[in-house]
Amino acid sequence: MEALVYTFLLVSTLGIIFFAIFFREPPKVPTKK
């Protein structure tokens, strides 16, 4: 059961880091439409 807990912690940590980097990006990105 410890493996499940470690997997959950790993996924949650990666998710937090991903969202932190994603939301830290400036929204004023030159979009070419």
Swiss-Prot record:
Any one cellular-component term (Gene Ontology): photosystem II reaction center
Transmembrane spans: 3-23
GO biological process, one term: photosynthesis
Location in the cell: Plastid, Chloroplast thylakoid membrane
InterPro entries attached to this UniProt entry: PSII_PsbT, PSII_PsbT_sf
Membrane topology per record: Single-pass membrane protein
Keyword entries, A-Z: Chloroplast, Membrane, Photosynthesis, Photosystem II, Plastid, Thylakoid, Transmembrane, Transmembrane helix
Complex formation: PSII is composed of 1 copy each of membrane proteins PsbA, PsbB, PsbC, PsbD, PsbE, PsbF, PsbH, PsbI, PsbJ, PsbK, PsbL, PsbM, PsbT, PsbY, PsbZ, Psb30/Ycf12, at least 3 peripheral proteins of the oxygen-evolving complex and a large number of cofactors. It forms dimeric complexes.
Family of the protein in this entry: Belongs to the PsbT family.
Function, as annotated: Found at the monomer-monomer interface of the photosystem II (PS II) dimer, plays a role in assembly and dimerization of PSII. PSII is a light-driven water plastoquinone oxidoreductase, using light energy to abstract electrons from H(2)O, generating a proton gradient subsequently used for ATP formation.
Name by which UniProt lists this protein: Photosystem II reaction center protein T
Species whose genome carries this gene: Sorghum bicolor (Sorghum)
